[in-house]
Swiss-Prot record:
The lineage of its organism: Archaea, Methanobacteriati, Methanobacteriota, Methanomada group, Methanococci. It is a single-pass membrane protein. The keyword Transferase does not apply. This is Uncharacterized protein MJ0163. One of its GO terms (cellular component) is membrane.
């Protein structure tokens, strides 16, 4: 009987030590990933001044769209709603550009009817305006690039931007689900 009790005690101690070692290694692994992530962010912060537009504009501190812009050699990405209000952007002050581009798209749409995109060549860059419908919202993606984008790149960029926007909109739908409907009606 004593042997069984000693065995059970040693077994439980062994399992607890094993679980403790496992959690310690997981904690260290997460800490390592966090350190690597912070180094990447710091490197992006160092890189941003070298690729930022020359017009005195600065990139924002959010790196989801900046990563897309850097990977495709794009200067700016601005996402606005149908009223011209900025949803997401790579620039700090993109309100004026977003509102102007969305109004240009709407004006051309009234003139020409059903259009898929608008491409404007200005001085040394291209301005692409794409309509996008996401979760019932009419959005416009405005891309400014010094190089012309081909159709395949456009689709890849829009797909990645849509993925980023889904993250933004998923948090909004989560918040709406957490708030009771009566509270929304009283507001």
């Amino acid at each position: 009987m004593d042997a069984i009790i000693i065995f059970l005690i040693l077994f439980i101690v062994g399992v607890l030590i094993g679980v403790g070692v496992y959690y310690y290694k997981e904690k260290e692994r997460k800490k390592t990933y966090k350190i690597i992530e912070m180094e990447i962010i710091e490197n992006l912060k160092e890189l941003k001044p070298y690729v930022a537009p020359d017009e005195g504009r600065e990139y924002t501190k959010e790196f989801d769209l900046v990563e897309i812009a850097l990977s495709y050699d794009i200067e700016d990405i601005i996402v606005v709603n149908d009223e011209g209000l900025v949803i997401a952007t790579t620039l700090k002050d993109a309100d004026e550009v977003g509102a102007t581009a969305s109004s240009i798209f709407e004006y051309i749409k009234k003139l020409c009817g059903n259009i898929k995109k608008v491409v404007i060549f200005k001085e040394d860059s291209y301005l692409y305006i794409y309509p996008l419908k996401l979760y019932g919202e009419n959005l416009y993606v405005i891309i400014e690039s010094k190089i012309a984008l081909d159709v395949i790149e456009e689709k890849e960029i829009l797909k990645r931007i849509t993925g980023v926007l889904k993250k933004y909109f998923s948090t909004i739908t989560t918040i709406e689900q957490e708030i009771p409907e009566e509270a929304l009606l009283s507001i």
